[in-house]
Regions:
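Acidic, Ser/Thr/Gly/Pro-rich intrinsically disordered interaction regions
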Residues: 1-35, 50-227
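Extended, well-ordered alpha-helical segments in internal regulatory regions
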Residues: 39-53
Length: 227
């Protein structure tokens, strides 16, 4: 596998999510694609480690199969790499949005689908603890029927949304939200975490996966060099 090409495909999927947001059907489709590519990148890290440590694993490559082969071959460097990777992975997923992504990936692995996608409105310029409000838009085969229907529903919900968010903004001396500063986007819930914005989560995660790849390669070289 060429990890760089897979990362590029992942970034293309992110662009497609942004392009079709807030259509739940297409966002779900491209987010599913994004997560599949993300999982391939993780597998690619172990493919490179397998090649460099000479374990000669067969696909599909998992952490468990990597560990078992490393133990059979008594390859201390490979075992050390896996221990390092698990710690590094946990560190990279401590922050909220990488943690959400990890939970979404685990959900998909377990249930073979993504959590349900919903359309919500939010302030275009976000501040901490701003509210989001779900809107019910007519769908056809889970797709938005028209932008006009979306706009009508946003306008219908706008007065209540603006009243609530601006009450919070006033209390915190934050800028007032105007009518033209509202956008619709796709969100989902995962475990006890509510209203996770899909575009933002996917965007935040790209640097995380790139760091994992870069630092894994450095760690592999260090272990081999110091052998």
């Amino acid at each position: 596998m060429n990890i760089e090409e897979t990362i590029e495909k992942c970034e293309i999927s992110l662009k497609q999510i942004k392009q079709y947001d807030p259509d739940p059907f297409y966002v779900n489709h491209f987010f599913e694609q994004y997560i599949s590519l993300r999982d391939k990148i993780i597998e690619g890290i172990f493919e490179e480690a397998d090649r460099d440590f000479g374990l000669f694993l067969t696909k599909p490559m998992t952490e468990e199969s990597f560990l078992q082969k490393a133990k059979i071959k008594n390859d201390e460097n490979a075992i050390k790499f896996l221990e390092w990777f698990r710690i590094k992975y946990a560190e990279e997923h401590k922050n909220p949005y990488p943690n959400f992504m990890n939970k979404i990936c685990n959900f998909r692995k377990k249930f073979e689908k993504l959590p349900d996608v919903k359309i919500m409105i939010r302030a275009s310029d976000r501040y901490k603890d701003d509210i989001n409000q779900e809107i019910q838009v007519p769908l056809s085969n889970k797709k938005l029927r028209s932008k006009n229907e979306l706009d009508i529903e946003i306008k219908r919900q706008l007065p209540v949304f603006l009243e609530i968010i601006n009450h919070k903004r006033r209390d915190r001396n934050e800028p007032k939200v105007a009518n033209n500063q509202i956008i619709a986007s796709t969100f989902l819930d995962i475990e006890n975490h509510k209203d996770i914005e899909i575009v933002y989560t996917a965007e935040i995660y790209i640097p995380v996966i790139k760091r994992l790849v870069e630092e894994a390669r450095i760690k592999i070289k260090d272990l081999i060099r110091n052998n």
